[in-house]
């Protein structure tokens, strides 16, 4: 995956591999040291065999997109880590270790991990896509959950956490 950006000093257009995002490179024209930006992830971008359809949500640990796994023609939730974590080798190792742990979990209330990797300097995790609304959206739309629904949800969450903790 290539990244195109301009030198902030002289305006020269640069093109470099996304694998070096976050690293400093010299401008070939004025020799200014520039930090290669993270690749832009947008609708239609293909990353590690997954074609991005649209953004599902953002959080402190990255963005989650609805994507199509091209090899299996199925929808997945594709988590993409922030650029600053993608260039930190220890963060990458922690991420891949967590992915290996997640891959061993098989529980009805835990989304399955399908694949993880790095493409063009971008770390990603493909997980099962669960169609529906987030709990946050439901509460915004309906207000507080009825007691029975809240208890049922907590029971499922506790079951998943207990299972994961035992593994």
Language model: regions and residue ranges:
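Conserved ATP-binding/catalytic core of the eukaryotic-like protein kinase fold
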Residues: 2-167
């Amino acid at each position: 995956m290539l990244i195109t950006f301009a030198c902030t000093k002289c305006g020269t257009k640069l093109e470099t591999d996304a694998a070096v995002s976050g690293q400093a490179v010299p401008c070939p024209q004025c020799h200014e040291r520039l930090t290669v930006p993270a690749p832009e992830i947008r609708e239609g971008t293909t990353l590690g065999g997954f074609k991005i359809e649209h953004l599902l949500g953002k959080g402190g640990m990255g963005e989650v997109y609805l994507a199509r796994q091209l090899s299996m023609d199925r929808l997945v939730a594709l988590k993409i880590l922030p650029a600053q974590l993608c260039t930190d080798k220890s963060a990458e190792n922690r991420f891949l270790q967590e992915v290996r742990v997640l891959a061993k979990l098989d529980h009805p209330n835990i989304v399955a991990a399908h694949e993880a990797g790095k493409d063009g300097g971008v770390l990603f995790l493909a997980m099962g896509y669960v169609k529906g609304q987030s709990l946050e959206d439901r509460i915004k739309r309906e207000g507080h959950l009825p007691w029975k629904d809240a208890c049922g949800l907590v029971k499922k969450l506790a079951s998943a956490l207990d299972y994961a903790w035992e593994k």
